[in-house]
Curated annotation (Swiss-Prot):
InterPro entries: DNA-binding_RecF, DNA-binding_RecF_CS, P-loop_NTPase, RecF/RecN/SMC_N, RecF_2. The keyword Glycoprotein does not apply. Gene3D superfamilies: P-loop containing nucleotide triphosphate hydrolases, RecF/RecN/SMC, N-terminal domain. It is found in: Cytoplasm. One of its GO terms (cellular component) is cytoplasm. This is DNA replication and repair protein RecF. Keywords: ATP-binding, Cytoplasm, DNA damage, DNA repair, DNA replication, DNA-binding, Nucleotide-binding, SOS response. HAMAP family: RecF (MF_00365). It comes from the Bacteria. GO terms for molecular function: ATP binding; single-stranded DNA binding. It holds the Pfam family SMC_N. The RecF protein is involved in DNA metabolism; it is required for DNA replication and normal SOS inducibility. RecF binds preferentially to single-stranded, linear DNA. It also seems to bind ATP. ATP binds at residues 30-37.
């Protein structure tokens, strides 16, 4: 897939900006706070309908305006696609594909596949379990857009079950109805099992790819292990055991859940452990080792999405390339070549190896305006 054109209207600090992409690599250069990351964020929104920077649409609409619009022309193997997203300060959204309004936003997902790599991704290693769960889920949505619906179902049941437990925890609350709790347990186990199984299946395909890239980048000096520990214990070779095991663990934790007013079993408590040569990378990995690990994960994402979707996704590198040493830059360049369209932001071109600049489209960004560099 290839992003040909992006058009921003009243988005962030852009009033009206159209960008034509004319090369496999586009480098956006300029000082901080000029709008480089905003442009990548617009592409992210068209892919995922989410921003990793903010949660409210009003923060995406230019100050003083009531709505903004992000549109793009994308070339897929099946033909051209026009994608449009209208954001309103009041939170209402409209999405369309080829000028046809899409009623369910979830049906908009899957038209534009991306892999993002920014300095925030170091939290994959350094952050808590929630960071790694969010990463798993984001990759899964790229591979299987229906997963967004399955995850939403689980989160809704979890929220309602927590509210039920919390309500009956109060001293003056009526006694908890065991039959009602059984119904909530069944719903949580059914939707949660689907989430766990998909996470497990995806990692089975991603782990070998990440291991290959990690060995290559580290010069075969380090061994990467990725351990997925579902909160519900079961043998992945026997997936039919997961649902009854889920219910069993809910029964075991029932009294504790009622005391705490909180669901203590389910994929919202899964963990992913990243090990380098058998040692937890979070506590003991050096900064260089952690960067190598995250780069290996991102390259694995690229390859896996390409395998599953059948087309190469876009790669968004947000102010991260200058943080990679020459070896890691070259490994990344060798991996993407010209097959993966890449959008790169940077404050200066001096940190780039000459090979990155060859045949790249270089755009200058200043105060919400994009100019072609000569």
């Amino acid at each position: 897939m290839y992003l040909q054109q992006l058009h921003l209207i009243q988005f962030r600090n852009y009033v009206a900006q159209q960008v034509e992409f004319s090369a496999p690599k586009t480098i956006l250069v300029g000082p901080n706070a000029q709008g480089k990351s905003n442009l990548l964020e617009a592409v992210e929104l068209l892919s995922t309908l989410k921003s990793h920077r903010v949660s409210r649409d009003r923060d995406l609409v230019k100050d003083g305006e009531s709505l903004s619009q992000v549109t793009a022309t994308l070339q897929r193997e099946s033909g051209p696609l026009d994608l449009s997203l209208t954001l309103r300060a009041n939170g209402r959204r409209t999405v369309s594909v080829n000028s046809e309004t899409i009623r369910r936003q979830l049906d908009f997902l899957g038209h534009l596949n991306i892999v993002q790599f920014s300095s925030l991704d170091m939290d994959l290693v350094r952050g808590g379990p929630g960071e790694r769960r969010n990463w798993l889920d984001a990759v899964l949505v790229q591979l299987e857009p229906v997963y967004a619906h399955l995850l939403q179902q689980y989160q809704q049941v979890l929220k309602q079950r927590n509210a039920y437990l919390k309500h009956h925890r109060a001293d003056d609350a009526p006694q908890l109805d065991p039959q009602q709790l059984v119904l909530w347990n069944q719903q949580l186990a059914a939707s949660g099992s689907r989430v766990i199984q998909r996470r497990q299946r995806m990692l089975m395909r991603l782990v070998p790819l990440a291991g290959h890239w990690h060995q290559t980048i580290s010069g075969h000096q380090e061994q990467l292990e990725i351990l997925y520990t579902p909160n519900v214990s079961y043998d992945p070779q026997f997936p039919e055991q997961l649902y009854p095991q889920f219910l069993s663990q809910l029964e075991e934790k029932s009294m504790l859940e009622q005391l705490q007013g909180l669901s203590l079993v389910g994929p919202h408590r899964d963990e992913v452990t990243l090990l380098i040569n058998g040692t937890p990378a979070r506590q003991y990995g050096s900064q260089g080792q952690q960067r190598t690990l995250v780069l290996a994960l991102k390259l694995a994402e690229l390859k896996l999405i390409e395998e599953v979707v059948g087309e190469a996704p876009l790669l968004l590198l947000d102010d991260v390339l200058a943080e990679l040493d020459l070896n890691r830059q070259n490994q990344l360049l060798d991996a993407i070549q010209t097959r993966f369209q890449t959008l790169i932001t940077t404050t200066h071109l001096g940190a780039f190896d000459a090979k990155w600049l060859d045949s790249a489209q270089i755009l200058t960004v200043k105060a919400g305006q994009v100019q072609f560099s000569t």
